[in-house]
Structures are given as C-alpha cells and as structure tokens.
Regions:
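An amphipathic alpha-helix signature
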Residues: 81-89, 93, 219-227
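Walker A/P-loop-proximal flanking segment of P-loop NTPase domains
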Residues: 1-45, 49-59, 128-129
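Mid-core helix/loop region of P-loop NTP-binding domains shared across ATPases and GTPases
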Residues: 91-141, 145-161, 165-177
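Switch/connector loops and helix/strand junctions flanking conserved nucleotide-binding motifs
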Residues: 49, 75-79, 186-191
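The catalytic "switch" region of P-loop NTPases
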Residues: 9-12, 148-227
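Short, well-ordered alpha-helices that flank and scaffold nucleotide-derived cofactor binding pockets
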Residues: 55-58, 62, 162-165
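Conserved catalytic segments around the Walker B and adjacent sensor/switch elements
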Residues: 40, 60-77, 139
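Surface-exposed alpha-helical interface segments used for non-catalytic interactions
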Residues: 26, 54, 86, 154-158, ...
Length: 227
C-alpha cells in the first residue's frame, strides 16, 4: 500500500510519510521513563503529541507493560469519584487483555471496588497490579486536559501523587512512569485542600518534572521525510 500524508490523526510509519522521530523516542525513554519520571507533554495541537505517545508505546512494550488511555471521549467518567474509578478500571482492563496479561491478574483488576472509598480501592488495585504483573508499568493518558477543570480529575492526580511519594519512601508500589499529554500543562492546576479557606491551595502534580524536548521539525528533518 502506498504511503500518504496524514494531518488529521496519528501518523503510522508503515502507512504515512512522517519525520523519523526515533531519536526523540529514545531520549524520552532514557531521560524520563528509565529514570522513573512523571511528566506532562503539553504542546499546541498538530505538534505530534498523540503520534509521539503511539511510537513511544510501541517501543516501551518491549520491556514494560504500557497502559495507554485517552480522555478524548471520557466526559462521563468525571461525574463522581466512583464513575472515574470504574471507567479507569474498564479502560485499563482492556489494555491488560490486549497485552496478554495473565487472566488471574485481569480478574483481580476488574473485581468490584469499594462504593464508599473508590479512589482508595483504585489505589490498592494499582499497588497489587504493579507487584504481581512481573513488569514495570507505564501509564499514558492523552487528551488529559479535557477535564482539567474538574475536581474529580484533580483528586485522581492527588492519588497518583500520594502513591508516587509513598513509593519513593519504600512504602508502596506504583507506576514506573506517568505521562499526561494535552494542550495545557496540568502541572499548574491547583487542588483546594481546605474549601473553607480560599487561600490554601496545593498543586496535585508538583511531583512532575519539566519536559524539555523540542518537538518542532527542522528543514533537515523534513527533507529526510521526503527523500
């Protein structure tokens, strides 16, 4: 099948003309994933975020279990903490099946969560999966800013932050790396810790490192694509 240009979605190397970004993927893997970093890829649309995640996932699957999600059509997840937890369990369950994870682990992951404490229950599932699957796990979420103004989403970031900090202290097991991709930098979002006191805020994503990667293309890059 002849290759064609794609400007409307994910670029597939086997199907589309595209700049070779394998060097960029290698640098992300070495400088961020292997170092256990949590980070955000925030760039304007048409900058290749989704394609970068796709190609990064393909590379990482050689050594990691990759949970690749998108909040593109997940508005209904953000009605409550319970709906978010249930939605994530469904989506991650699909990732586990697609990557041929042991059926026993999938059944455990998909078991019912606590109705009263859905986020705590989700956190326990993450711990159990990370301890049992035999591979380090990378979580990727594209279009993450679709619900970035939602308190429910911020609570989920708070859960990831709590587990990351406990893991650093040797008290928990959690994802090797978390990548959030979107137009805006969710690192700047604020979680109100004390509703009765307007002045007290804290960032739920202050564990994230800055992502220093030029995602633009040079004339030489583009020339290589056309040759």
């Amino acid at each position: 099948m002849a290759k064609r240009f794609c400007v409307t979605g994910t670029c597939i190397p086997e199907k589309n003309y595209m700049v070779d970004i394998s060097g960029r993927i290698d640098r992300i893997t070495k400088d961020y994933i292997e170092q256990g970093q949590y980070f955000t890829i925030n760039r304007a649309r048409q900058y290749g975020k989704t394609t970068t995640l796709f190609l990064l996932e393909r590379k990482l699957r050689e050594e990691y279990l990759v949970l690749s999600l998108s909040f593109e059509a997940a508005d209904e997840y953000f009605q409550s903490l319970s709906t978010l937890a249930e939605g994530l369990i469904l989506d991650i369950g699909e990732c586990l099946r697609e990557q041929k994870v042991e059926e026993k682990l999938i059944e455990e992951w998909c078991s019912p969560i606590s109705e009263k404490f859905p986020m705590r229950s989700l956190g326990q599932k993450i711990t159990s999966l990370c301890r049992s699957c035999g591979k380090k796990i990378v979580l990727m979420i594209d279009e993450v800013d679709k619900s970035s103004d939602n308190q429910i989403f911020l609570s989920f970031l708070g859960l990831l932050r709590e587990k990351y900090l406990k893991c650093q202290q040797g008290k928990d097991d959690t994802f090797q790396s978390v990548i959030l991709a979107g137009v805006y930098d969710v690192k700047t979002l604020k979680l109100k810790l004390h509703p009765q006191e307007e002045s007290k805020y804290n960032s739920p994503w202050n564990i994230a490192v800055d992502f220093y990667m030029d995602m633009s293309f040079s004339a030489k890059d583009i020339q290589g694509m056309l040759q």
